[in-house]
Amino acid sequence: MAFRTICVLVGVFICSICVKGSSQPQARVYLTFDELRETKTSEYFSLSHHPLDYRILLMDEDQDRIYVGSKDHILSLNINNISQEPLSVFWPASTIKVEECKMAGKDPTHGCGNFVRVIQTFNRTHLYVCGSGAFSPVCTYLNRGRRSEDQVFMIDSKCESGKGRCSFNPNVNTVSVMINEELFSGMYIDFMGTDAAIFRSLTKRNAVRTDQHNSKWLSEPMFVDAHVIPDGTDPNDAKVYFFFKEKLTDNNRSTKQIHSMIARICPNDTGGLRSLVNKWTTFLKARLVCSVTDEDGPETHFDELEDVFLLETDNPRTTLVYGIFTTSSSVFKGSAVCVYHLSDIQTVFNGPFAHKEGPNHQLISYQGRIPYPRPGTCPGGAFTPNMRTTKEFPDDVVTFIRNHPLMYNSIYPVHKRPLIVRIGTDYKYTKIAVDRVNAADGRYHVLFLGTDRGTVQKVVVLPTNSSVSGELILEELEVFKNHAPITTMKISSKKQQLYVSSNEGVSQVSLHRCHIYGTACADCCLARDPYCAWDGHSCSRFYPTGKRRSRRQDVRHGNPLTQCRGFNLKAYRNAAEIVQYGVKNNTTFLECAPKSPQASIKWLLQKDKDRRKEVKLNERIIATSQGLLIRSVQGSDQGLYHCIATENSFKQTIAKINFKVLDSEMVAVVTDKWSPWTWASSVRALPFHPKDIMGAFSHSEMQMINQYCKDTRQQHQQGDESQKMRGDYGKLKALINSRKSRNRRNQLPES
């Protein structure tokens, strides 16, 4: 058994430790930006040291490219390594428009530039791109070549007006989808930012938009995302869904509340014949609810939708919609993740319509006659095969849509509660991406949650005995050095990569880093990462098609006792024993930091050959996340301390400290600068710090030094020993210097 003796002769050096009491879960592994880079599982790209507001707007896995919009630039990055072979097009706003923007009082840095906000695939060779154009939106076609090997990336056409396709203000989000070379956008259509619209443009048919200045349709919306989603087997029944939040007045018309909403329209809607001409005749919307119900009844709402991710399946009706929500309250702050079944969303849109009635304009379910075809039905679909266009809709259908676009029922998440709730944290969630992972014990959903502090949390959803799923934070990664909020996020299950953008650049991160969990089977099993398993030699990537017998993995329970038999589990019962000295009536610190913050720590004390007993914590003996702090050390504190970590019912001893208490008077005499001993009087004049002794000598050398101290104390009254001690001190100094120089040779040079 290895012993390391730490002899405390001059004071006790203690780092200040902040103990935080928080019920919020912590990541099992936290990697800083530099630590993440050292794992060789990330890449970073930026055009310059200046922030350029990067947004990942399109991912093309067929051509192995991701397309990024930023201030005055359009980027094409290699999907396999974003730092290799980047292509860029410089596309600034015209000088005249920039000057006009400044004259209008807009921000020269964050407003008066061409911030690219729309990149959509137009055809096999071209992209359609739009930018804010210094508060004068512009669009153009960009040639990207037929194949990625062509290395073509250039604007080969004239710019055209982007009005109705991109917002004037770059700080107001624009969402868009391209269907059959037609662009569907959600944005603000005017310079002042008062006319919000869902618009179809770039079409050979007539342009169509939402009813203008009609708060029943849109009320100061902030668009979040847009998706095309099938509805049944007939392609004519497909809908475009827009996710947004809007400000709605309460029944007293005195205050405005933020509600999250889903709206949908039919792509083949051409507007009405006599009413709603060039306006959507299939526009419907419903409220999206993400709330927590307290035990005493009231609901706490996470009102503000921040991001949406669709986890698609072979059957569109089983698609899951993940949403990030935050609170709008200035008192109660938090984030939540809610999950919705697409079938539940479609059920609400097929349900009753909302109707305002009475002096207080209370919302009730519409009880009158519903016209045929049902409002919101697409022409030419399964229910209206004989109506080829919305212009054939009866007038009462169009009138009904204009006055009743809102559904009565709200859309609630699975189990009517959030999957994840974070309250009282120093961050909030901003973006989400989800991967479906096959593990040895089942299929799991892994969430990648971007924060406003430039980190990404990797969270696995765990099934529980109840109807509510559990969750475990596997990792938290600093993907940006300056903690810039994450603005966009794309995931590639095919490439097993995550792509993240912020104001300062773009980062690429692997979905897994199995080797960082440890070099033992138990470490790999405790990680509970569905991407990773123990292969008999190391923690490595798990492939469901491989030989399962040789793979050890337990995501659901994370129990090494059942998975790691035969892999030296007994080694976890023992730990190297060290000897540590403390001075009576002083403070000392017994260090013990588990690998995982999710592990619970218990301290046991064994005196002589007695049984181990749990250390009683009080104001004098305090347990911290880094160890045990003992204030005003007493003789009764002496003994063998065992630091036991427990995680998922698996216990391991991670520290054994033989703590010995020294008499304070003896230590004071030994270190007295007026002492007649040459050794003691020389301590203050040493050219090195006393704590250097701890790392400078081996165990055998420290034994020799201890013996030397003992002999010196016994002979201090003999006058002829003074000269000998001076000589021995010279040898001691030379030995320390030689050991320190050897240590420096093994260290990296300071930067």
Curated annotation (Swiss-Prot):
Glycans are attached at residues 81, 123, 252, 268, 465, 585-586. Residues 712-731 have a biased composition (Basic and acidic residues). Residues 712-751 are annotated as: Disordered. Residues 571-655 form the Ig-like C2-type domain. Residues 28-511 form the Sema domain. GO terms for biological process: axon guidance; blood vessel remodeling; cardiac endothelial to mesenchymal transition; cardiac right ventricle morphogenesis; dichotomous subdivision of terminal units involved in salivary gland branching; limb bud formation; neural crest cell migration; neural tube development. It is found in: Secreted. Keywords: Developmental protein, Differentiation, Disulfide bond, Glycoprotein, Immunoglobulin domain, Neurogenesis, Secreted, Signal. Residues 1-21 form the signal peptide. Interacts with PLXND1. Belongs to the semaphorin family. It comes from the Eukaryota. The keyword Lipid metabolism does not apply. GO terms for molecular function: chemorepellent activity; semaphorin receptor binding. It comes from Pongo abelii (Sumatran orangutan). Binds to plexin family members and plays an important role in the regulation of developmental processes. Required for normal cardiovascular development during embryogenesis. Functions as attractant for growing axons, and thereby plays an important role in axon growth and axon guidance. Disulfide bonds join 101-112, 130-139, 266-378, 290-338, 514-532, 592-643. This is Semaphorin-3C. GO terms for cellular component: extracellular space; plasma membrane. The keyword Metal-binding does not apply.
